[in-house]
């Protein structure tokens, strides 16, 4: 779907079977601009961003239940990626990850997440430069009669 509208699309997937399925779909659909990488996002994201430096980038991130790795969050905040779509299956880790991406939570010297003092006195809805603002958030009940919910969040860098 995205590969038909973009110059290049990269997929980074940890599960070998899912990566093979993506390669198969790429071949079946003749998507020469799609590149699938099997491995950890934290090991490959920086290389992809370096390769695409200067290009208009968009990111769709669907982390595991444990949430986004801290190294990936740091890379995203340091990146020039202006828009991101985050998909989450865990409300608790989504809240944590959004706190970091919006700058409302920061890591202290002990590696613990704490409230960012730079937000003291900042008006509600205002985002500090270099962080992401939440544009839209939508939960989806894809598993009726269970406690599980998928949430899609659209973010834009300030």
Where on the chain are the PLM-derived regions?
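Rossmann-like S-adenosyl-L-methionine
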Residues: 1-158
């Amino acid at each position: 779907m995205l590969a038909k509208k973009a110059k290049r699309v990269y997929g980074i997937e940890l599960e070998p079977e899912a990566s093979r399925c993506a390669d198969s779909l790429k071949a079946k659909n003749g998507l020469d601009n799609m590149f699938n990488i099997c491995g950890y996002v934290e090991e490959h994201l920086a290389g992809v961003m370096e390769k695409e430096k200067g290009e208009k980038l968009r990111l769709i991130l669907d982390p595991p239940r444990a949430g986004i790795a801290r190294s990936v969050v740091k890379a995203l905040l340091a990146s020039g990626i202006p828009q991101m779509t985050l998909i989450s299956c865990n409300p608790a880790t989504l809240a944590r990850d959004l706190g970091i991406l919006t700058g409302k939570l920061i890591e202290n010297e002990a590696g613990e997440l704490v409230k960012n003092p730079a937000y003291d006195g900042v008006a509600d809805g205002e985002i500090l430069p270099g962080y992401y603002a939440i544009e839209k958030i939508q939960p989806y009940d894809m598993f009726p009669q269970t406690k599980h919910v998928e949430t899609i969040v659209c973010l834009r860098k300030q």
